[in-house]
Amino acid sequence: MKIANECVVNIEYTLRDDTGEIIDSSDVMGALEYVQGHGMIIPGLETALINREEGEEFSVTIPPVGAYGEVQEDLRMTVGRDQFPPNVPIEVGMRFDAGSGGDSRPVTVTDVQGETIIVDGNHPLAGKTLHFEVAVRSVREATDDDLAALLFRESTSGGGCGSGAGGCGSCGAGCH
């Protein structure tokens, strides 16, 4: 069965940076299961998985545009210490949600200069080329229950069906 939209796919992977250092691996968190075509994984990897089959192993290099994008300088900001919880010591590497209400974004503290804190709203892997080694462990057609759970997840996380790529229903093509 080939991977196509509306398939539930289970993969094992190792992710490395340009130096060969392991950034992430399914050895740590277990195999990754996702529904193809719903933007649950980075676009470059999702595209590389199309038409792959159970048991297939491959390597793929994903440039920043297919992963977490280029670094956006306007997401690096200087803020006052008073913008953080008063009883929490602020240290480089800490992550906070910045913003108010439902419009928040995770930021990472990159520098602390007394009462001035430098934060970065870019994803930690923004601007990086990613190197994946992938093993496709299973592929099956998504059931109605799989899709219902996915729609519930998207509606509670603020994500859109198919990441704006179309409707929520089955594409009709199924897994091949």
Swiss-Prot record:
Q: Domain comment, in the record's words?
A: The N-terminal region consists of two globular folded domains that contain prolyl isomerase and chaperone activities. The C-terminal region binds nickel ions.
- Write out the ranges of the annotated region (IF-chaperone): 76-120
Per the record, its GO cellular-component terms are: cytoplasm
The enzyme's E.C. designation? 5.2.1.8
Annotated residues that bind Ni(2+) are located at C161, C168, C175
Boundaries of each PPIase FKBP-type domain copy? 1-95
> Could you tell me the gene encoding this protein?
slyD
What's this protein's name?
Answer: FKBP-type peptidyl-prolyl cis-trans isomerase SlyD
What organism does the record attribute this protein to?
Treponema pallidum (strain Nichols)
Major subcellular site:
cytoplasm
Family membership: Belongs to the FKBP-type PPIase family.
Which residues does UniProt call coiled coil?
Answer: none
Q: Where is this region: PPIase second part?
A: 129-151
* Region (PPIase first part) residue spans: 1-69
UniProt keywords (A-Z) are: Chaperone, Cytoplasm, Isomerase, Metal-binding, Nickel, Rotamase
Q: Which SUPFAM superfamilies match?
A: FKBP-like (SSF54534)
Q: Which reaction does it catalyse?
A: [protein]-peptidylproline (omega=180) = [protein]-peptidylproline (omega=0)
| Cell location | Cytoplasm
Q: Report the GO molecular function annotations.
A: metal ion binding; peptidyl-prolyl cis-trans isomerase activity
